[in-house]
A protein has these predicted regions:
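Peripheral docking tails and interdomain loops at the edges
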Residues: 171-181
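Short glycine-rich anion-binding loops that position phosphate/pyrophosphate groups of nucleotides
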Residues: 78-79, 105-107, 129-131, 179-181
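C-terminal helical cap/extension that packs against the catalytic core
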Residues: 71-74, 80, 111-172
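Short hydrophobic segments within beta-strands
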Residues: 101-103, 126, 176
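Nucleotide phosphate-binding/pyrophosphate-handling subdomain across enzymes
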Residues: 4-122
Length: 181
């Protein structure tokens, strides 16, 4: 099977993260089919779309770097599939200490997600301001059962602020667990 990415050497994608390789392949596979259906997609349009996808779509939070020193990354991965990619990506980072700010909604596979998260991190359990948000105390209890330790914060800004205050420049802060965080 021919790799469609070969048709676009040096293709730059604004979205980062290991899972984007698979997403890129899927999109590039669809382009010839879209052309057959009458869509006029030039190579330049494809390259521009990949390079500026966040600006063009408003998409945020896909392994999005918000800060350096300490590195602060957010990702909207919120299920076992997404968290699997995120934990692989975290293993490839270098840092002194990992700070994980996690919040989830109550209708996801919380046990499955928590089982995948790194145990050596310091956790900041929080919740989004949506009705389906799992209370941070419940999340912390479930996380403790999965071997994850940390403290509770009533909202995302206070969790982020505390993690930043406790971090050194060579640390890594991750924010995720829900699209609403």
């Amino acid at each position: 099977e021919e790799d469609e990415k070969d048709d676009y050497p040096g293709l730059e994608c604004e979205l980062k993260g290991l899972y984007q390789t698979k997403n890129t392949r899927t999109l590039l596979t669809a382009i010839p089919e879209l052309r057959k259906a009458g869509y006029n997609l030039s190579e330049q349009a494809v390259r521009s779309g990949f390079a500026h996808v966040c600006e063009l779509t408003g998409l945020m939070g896909r392994w999005q770097k918000l800060q350096d020193a300490p590195t602060l990354i957010c990702d909207t991965g919120h299920n076992v599939g997404g968290i699997t990619y995120i934990t692989e990506q975290l293993k490839q980072q270098s840092y002194r200490k990992l700070h994980m700010i996690i919040g989830m909604v109550n209708d996801k596979d919380i046990h499955g997600v928590l089982a995948l998260l790194p145990q050596e991190a310091e956790y900041y359990f929080t919740k989004a301001s949506v009705r389906r948000a799992l209370p941070e105390s419940e999340l912390a209890q479930l996380a403790s059962e999965a071997g994850l330790q940390g403290n509770c914060y009533p909202d995302v800004p206070s969790a982020v602020r505390t993690a930043q205050e406790k971090s050194l420049p060579e640390d890594f802060i991750f924010v995720g667990g829900s699209s609403f965080i």
